[in-house]
Amino acid sequence: MSSNDNYIFELPIKVRDYEVDSEGIVNNANYLHYLEHTRHEFCHQAGFSFREMHSQGIDPVLRKVEIEYLTPLGLGEEMISKLNLVRQGVRFIFQQDIYKPDGTPVVKASVICVCIENGKLSRGDILAQRFEKYLNK
């Protein structure tokens, strides 16, 4: 996982009370939710609807997620979730990082998605067309 300063999308998020554990820090599983929420907001703002794509037989699915936990967050803390998108063959790689507002890195993640079309793995060309203006090549 590499750091990336060329983000195409940013989303501010605040830690809610039910996301922290008994130690008062964000439970590690919740970072998956933050990353997913960021991808979904990116897709929504880019004009994509998962429901619409599914009705057309197009389903982006997760293949692999790697997360490096760097700095904990606590109750009420704010964060900025950032995203970049790269295509490598059939894979769409979301390079996602979360930072504190002061720039302290919290999480670095790489999320690999592939595209299923009509129940079968595809090259993802339809998805690539939809993401074309956002893809870093």
Question: Positions of the model-derived regions?
Answer:
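A broad, structural micro-motif
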Residues: V26, P60-L62, V106
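Residue-level recognition of well-ordered beta-strand positions that form the cores
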Residues: P12-K14, E66-E68, K82-N84, D97, ...
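Short coil/loop residues immediately preceding or within conserved phosphate-binding loops
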Residues: E10, L62-K64, I93
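Catalytic strand-loop segment that frames the active site of acyl-thioester-processing enzymes
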Residues: M1-F42
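Short, basic/aromatic beta-hairpin or loop at an interaction surface
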Residues: M53-P60
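HotDog/MaoC-like acyl-thioester-processing domains
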Residues: S3-Y7, H44, G74-L75, L85-K137
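Short beta-strand/loop turn elements enriched in aromatics
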Residues: H37-M53
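Active-site beta-strand->loop segment that positions catalytic residues and contacts the acyl thioester
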Residues: V61-E78, N84-Q88
